[in-house]
């Protein structure tokens, strides 16, 4: 997979009314009544005032657990955006395809990539399981119809509109009524070669640097790392071209990749993700757009989509 690095950004100023708009929405919805009189609440205060219904548990059937020597990486899959690729990845996981393969590329401020290092060598490449496909149509975007899209009020360089849906950062074009996942930090995509190759999911990567948004709608994005991101971001950088390791001994071995639904219940990740369609999430965005902490001299009054935190927490222990 050939991914090129590029940076771009803009800075604009918001009015006080716009800065308070999301807090007003949140207060009207009643999800954070304790914050209604405090438009300058911090993110920590917003989360502390959240309700159990503001959070959702990960679906074990849509959750990948990748075990490395350093620990576990948990990935929430986005079948609602890339159903064919996600189904293929699930087939690969059920067949234990990734077990014993390696992390082959760590490019600074860009991606960590894993899969079969010998995939380009027919004599050495690991065969795909019978129920997995080697070629799939692209899933770079989908219809926006029926999508619970929480639009961010600030502008964007790459998309007409940006926001969040089902816990993922999303771009939307109202003219074509299409939506797509964004290449924010922690997002997971499918490695591919030049078109017409669209990747099968046998080679995956996670964004570990500044969001490479020029990749949006050029690669199928299949999910987001919700735990263990530090394990992927802290790996030694590859010294070869595009961050690939020159020495195979420097690669990190993958001990296993499983769907959480295949793990014993006691070994499944007990994680909850903040719902992005809630007033609590709207209040969180407002808190991050207009930073009220005493450290800030000039709060920005706006925020880019990839700078909005998507909180994950360990699920509270069940009451006896």
Regions found by a protein language model. Name each.
Residues 11, 24-26, 33:
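N-terminal non-cleavable signal-anchor helices
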Residues 1-11:
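N-terminal secretory signal peptides that target proteins for export/translocation
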Residues 4-6, 21, 31:
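Helix-centric, low-specificity signal for extended rod-like, repetitive segments
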Residues 10-15, 67:
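Intrinsically disordered, low-complexity Ser/Thr/Pro-rich tracts
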Residues 2, 30-320:
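Cyclophilin-like peptidyl-prolyl cis-trans isomerases
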Residues 16-28:
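Bacterial N-terminal signal peptides
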């Amino acid at each position: 997979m050939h991914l090129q690095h590029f940076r771009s950004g803009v800075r604009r100023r918001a009015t006080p009314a716009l800065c308070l708009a999301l807090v007003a929405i949140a207060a009207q919805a009643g999800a954070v009544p304790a914050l209604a009189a405090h438009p300058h609440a911090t993110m920590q205060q917003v989360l502390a005032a959240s309700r159990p219904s503001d959070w959702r548990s990960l679906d074990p059937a849509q959750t990948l657990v990748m075990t490395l020597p350093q620990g576990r990486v948990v990935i929430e899959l986005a079948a609602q955006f890339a159903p064919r690729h996600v189904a293929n990845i699930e087939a690969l996981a059920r067949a234990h395809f990734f077990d014993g393969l390696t992390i082959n590329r760590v490019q600074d401020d860009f991606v960590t990539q894993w899969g079969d290092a010998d995939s380009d060598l027919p004599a050495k490449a690991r065969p795909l399981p019978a129920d997995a496909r080697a070629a799939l149509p692209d899933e770079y975007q989908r219809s926006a119809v029926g999508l619970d899209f929480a639009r961010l009020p600030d502008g964007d360089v790459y998309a007409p509109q940006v926001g969040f849906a089902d816990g993922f950062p999303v771009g939307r074009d109202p003219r074509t009524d299409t939506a797509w996942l964004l290449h924010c930090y922690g997002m997971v995509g499918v490695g591919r070669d030049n078109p017409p190759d669209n990747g099968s999911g046998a080679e995956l990567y996670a964004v570990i640097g500044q969001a490479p948004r020029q990749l949006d709608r050029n690669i199928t994005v299949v999910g987001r790392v919700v735990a263990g991101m530090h394990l992927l971001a802290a790996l030694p950088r590859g010294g070869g071209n595009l961050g690939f390791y020159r020495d195979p001994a420097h690669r990190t071995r993958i001990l296993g990749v499983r769907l959480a639904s295949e793990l014993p219940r006691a070994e499944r990740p007990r994680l909850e993700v903040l719902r992005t369609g809630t007033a609590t999430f709207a209040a969180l965005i407002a808190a991050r757009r207009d930073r009220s902490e005493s450290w800030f001299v000039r709060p920005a009054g706006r925020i880019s989509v990839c700078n909005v935190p998507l909180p994950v927490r360990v699920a509270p222990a069940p009451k006896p």
